């Protein structure tokens, strides 16, 4: 079945306070869709490593307190909520490697990871809320793209936390294999430390060679355009 957006509001651009709650999930439930999953990704901007997506179905009676956009939380708080989410919710995680990103593009790789996370949920979702502008193609249920969804829906916020913590842990492990770049400190983003590592050692197998700064590095160490996100 081809995914579709809500006919009355496919994208949300309203001016409601950016505090995540459960209203969108309850609206979908009222329309006959249950359970509702939230989905988000982490790692679209880095120069190295995978993009990681997560899908989360929260238990309405056991929603962890303090869920929010992962970027608004400290690393310690994300880790705490990550443990709580895994203990109380249905969670699925998928990723697209740097090779996959280079073979397609970051948008397609992100949506593919999100689709696989949603489709791998142990409890099939009846409806999906995704962060951003797109609902992944190839789903078996309808979905709604929510602009700034990780600040509006607790389900999307939970997914953003799971994706972020998972990716950060992956990059910390990658640091043990490729210690010259400082992946544990910046998770692959274009920091000064990362730029220095690329200039000195060249790119490794985790780098996204389709990203313009890395394409330049193949011809010479021109890192001026690497701007941290």
From Swiss-Prot:
Gene Ontology molecular functions: manganese ion binding; RNA binding; RNA-DNA hybrid ribonuclease activity
Cell membrane found in the keyword field: no
Superkingdom field: Bacteria
Pfam families according to UniProt: RNase_HII
Residue span of region Disordered: 209-229
Acidic residues bias spans: 220-229
Enzyme class, spelled out: hydrolase
Single biological process term from Gene Ontology: mismatch repair
Necessary cofactors: Mn(2+); Mg(2+)
Keyword Iron-sulfur: no
Annotated binding of a divalent metal cation, by residue: 40-41, 131
Co-factor binding comment: Manganese or magnesium. Binds 1 divalent metal ion per monomer in the absence of substrate. May bind a second metal ion after substrate binding.
EC number: 3.1.26.4
Subcellular location field: Cytoplasm
Catalytic activity: Endonucleolytic cleavage to 5'-phosphomonoester
UniProt xrefs under InterPro entries: RNase_HII, RNase_HII/HIII, RNase_HII/HIII_dom, RNaseH-like_sf, RNaseH_sf
Limits of the RNase H type-2 domain: 34-223
GO cellular component, one term: ribonuclease H2 complex
Principal localisation: cytoplasm
Key words of the record: Cytoplasm, Endonuclease, Hydrolase, Manganese, Metal-binding, Nuclease
Family, as annotated: Belongs to the RNase HII family.
Annotated function: Endonuclease that specifically degrades the RNA of RNA-DNA hybrids.
NCBIfam families found in the cross-reference section: PRK00015.1-3 (NF000595)
HAMAP family attached to this UniProt entry: RNase_HII_B
Name the record gives this protein: Ribonuclease HII
Source organism of the structure: Rhizobium etli (strain CIAT 652)
